[in-house]
Design a protein with these regions (language model features):
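Beta-rich carbohydrate-recognition and catalytic domains
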Residues: 1-88, 94-144, 149-201, 211-269, ...
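Conserved glycosyltransferase catalytic-site signature
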Residues: 202-203, 273
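Functionally critical, mid-to-C-terminal surface segments that flank or help form catalytic/ligand
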Residues: 207-208
Length: 311
């Protein structure tokens, strides 16, 4: 039975629960070749294709936020670049109705200053392989963290991440459409906001969604807050979601920065940042793919956070 939550809990309470129950076993840094001094972080989960595993990662120099997404072939912890699409970041890959669906964020830069970001939007691509992806949908301006998932009846679930206008620093919305062709800006804007997922001083979003064997959705997301000095704190989190009723289980943190390998940060205010790409389930454990401090990426073995939702 789904244990429904009705009131958001702040990060400090979720961290207390995490420290009592955490199951983090090991972490390994992902190594990316042929990147000519660029960092690769905020990776997707691997997607199997033609007997090989591929991941997407955000690549940029340490001093810049102007980036591109690069696809890599993954062998163990070593990753070799294959081909870049024409988007900047926001890496997510999934299979929907037999097709690969890739979502990424395209940046708009200021024509007077190419290093200044003037806007962005999420774009979606589909294809039989990563080499023949073609655009099919785009989200609203200034919205990222949009994720698609195939539901048990074959329809497509859409998680959104509105900000402002009642959504504060960032909330999560949900809607569903019949087909990928129905994923439109209007459908995304019409998503119903899931209430009380985060407190008003905190924010979060959805990163990776799994269809569980009971029809619920296992959600890997992030929850975040800002402390003094504009220091950001990001934590991978999980919950189960009922797409029929919009009910969800209490959010739980599943990893934190101090429990992975030491690594450099892009800036001091990003030291305490783990940004999840998602998990690969493997029995009672799972591999969590995370970007670390906006500079590197790691694969962290944790206890499978979805097992309790399928019991």
């Amino acid at each position: 039975m789904l244990s429904v939550t009705l009131q958001a809990r702040p990060c400090y309470e979720l961290l207390e629960d995490y420290e009592k129950n955490k199951r983090v076993f090991r972490a390994a840094k992902l190594e990316f070749s042929s990147m000519a001094g660029r960092d690769v972080y905020n990776v997707s989960v691997p997607l199997l294709m033609d007997g090989a595993a591929y991941i997407a990662g955000r690549a940029e120099t340490r001093a810049s936020e102007i980036s591109e997404v690069v696809f890599f072939r993954k062998t163990g912890r070593f990753c070799t670049p294959v081909c870049p699409p024409a988007v900047s970041y926001g890496e997510c890959m999934a299979r929907i109705r037999g097709e690969i669906v890739f979502g990424g964020v395209r940046l708009k830069t200021d024509p007077r200053d190419p290093q200044k970001i003037a806007g962005y939007r999420t774009e979606f691509y589909r294809g039989s392989t990563i080499r023949d992806l073609r655009p099919f949908a785009a989200g609203p301006e200034h919205m990222k963290d949009i994720r698609l998932v195939q539901l048990s009846d074959g329809t497509v679930g859409i998680f959104t991440r509105p900000q402002g206008n009642g959504a504060g620093k960032g909330k999560v919305g949900f809607t569903r459409v019949d087909r990928l062709e129905d994923v439109t800006r209007e459908a995304i804007l019409g998503a119903e906001i899931i209430p009380s997922l985060f407190t008003e001083d905190e924010w979060g979003g959805v990163n990776n969604v799994h269809l569980l064997k009971n029809g619920l959705l296992g959600v890997i997301g992030h929850i975040a807050y800002m402390s003094r000095g504009m220091t950001r704190h990001y934590f991978p989190a999980a919950f189960a979601f009922n797409p029929e009723t919009l009910e969800y289980t209490p959010v739980k943190i599943i990893c934190r920065r101090s429990d992975v390998l030491d690594a450099p940060a892009k800036r001091p205010d990003l030291k305490d940042v783990l940004f999840p790409g998602g998990i690969v389930r493997k029995g009672e454990r799972a591999d969590l793919y995370v970007g670390v401090s906006d500079a590197t990426a790691q694969c962290v073995e944790i206890g499978d956070p979805f097992l309790e939702y399928e019991a």
